[in-house]
């Protein structure tokens, strides 16, 4: 909905962004990484077994000293010591980061056999008769009336069927602010969201042309060099990222 064209590039054409992640995005990515592997991080802090941090060093070329002094680690540990952090990170969880609606779940996709639904979720906490689906957020806090729950509601459809629980709580957790927006769901809501998903799938299949939604964020889009290269000059850090731009595209931008 934000930009159908960017969605097409990523999920239909399966293109990858042409620029490296900027510092802000990398910071957010590392915070997510530490939270998703919080148990391993705790083990390292207890045992000093460096292998427990393999998940982090595979993604970052950084010394142990720099890691221990990093802003990302400080943010995660402060969150872990907060009341909200304790309520999330120390509960029993299951590794269900990737959600795939395969043939067993095709009831949600209707008669379409050529549709795949894949989703990713940061953390799933589990108790006897309920689940918590947790989406960690970095950056600015979003006020409750602006929070959209659609994506996690669709994930909840999968979880109700897989785990046979009576209640699922969706939690959008803003790590740096120790705030959350949450919503509780029951199995009775599945039918509505199942129909909503079917309609979305049908709409995608019937779309002949995905339109661009031009806005002020276009210069930072992963696909700006494919979609409208000249827009990248509107970035304040343009001079710093020019060396990442392929020569033939840079010539078109500069001319």
Question: Which residue ranges define each predicted feature?
Answer:
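Short, cysteine/histidine-rich loop/knuckle motifs that typically chelate Zn2+
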Residues: 2, 220, 229
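Cys/His-rich metal-chelating microdomains
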Residues: 6, 224, 230
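A non-catalytic, helix-rich entry segment at domain boundaries
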Residues: 26-107
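Mg2+/Mn2+-dependent nuclease catalytic core
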Residues: 99-199
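Short, polar/flexible loop-turn hinges at active-site or ligand-entry regions and domain interfaces
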Residues: 15-22, 43, 141-143, 208-212
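C-terminal, charged and often intrinsically disordered regions of DNA end-processing helicases
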Residues: 1-27, 252-255
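Polybasic (Lys/Arg-rich)
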Residues: 190-224
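Short microdomains enriched in Cys/His and/or Lys/Arg
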Residues: 24, 232-255
């Amino acid at each position: 909905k934000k930009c159908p064209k960017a969605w097409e590039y990523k999920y239909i054409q399966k293109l990858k962004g042409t620029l490296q992640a900027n510092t802000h995005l990398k910071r957010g990515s590392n915070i997510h990484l530490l939270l998703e592997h919080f148990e391993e991080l705790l083990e390292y802090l207890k045992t000093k077994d460096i292998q427990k941090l393999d998940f982090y060093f595979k993604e970052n070329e950084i010394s142990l000293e720099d890691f221990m002094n990093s802003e990302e680690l400080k943010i995660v540990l402060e969150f872990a010591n907060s009341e909200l952090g304790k309520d999330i990170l120390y509960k029993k969880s299951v590794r269900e980061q990737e959600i795939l609606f395969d043939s067993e779940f095709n009831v949600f996709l209707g008669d379409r056999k050529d549709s795949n639904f894949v989703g990713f979720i940061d953390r799933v906490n589990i108790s006897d008769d309920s689940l918590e689906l947790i989406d960690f957020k970095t950056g600015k806090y979003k006020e409750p009336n602006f929070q959209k729950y659609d994506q996690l509601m669709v994930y909840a459809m999968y979880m109700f069927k897989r785990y046979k629980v009576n209640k699922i709580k969706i939690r959008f957790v803003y790590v740096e602010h120790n705030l959350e927006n949450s919503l509780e769901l029951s199995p009775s809501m599945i039918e509505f969201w199942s129909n909503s998903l079917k309609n979305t799938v049908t709409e995608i299949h019937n779309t002949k042309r995905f339109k661009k939604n031009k806005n002020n964020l276009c210069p930072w889009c992963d696909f700006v060099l494919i979609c409208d290269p000249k827009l990248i000059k509107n970035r304040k850090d343009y001079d710093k990222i020019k060396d990442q731009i392929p020569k033939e595209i840079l010539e078109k931008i500069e001319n």
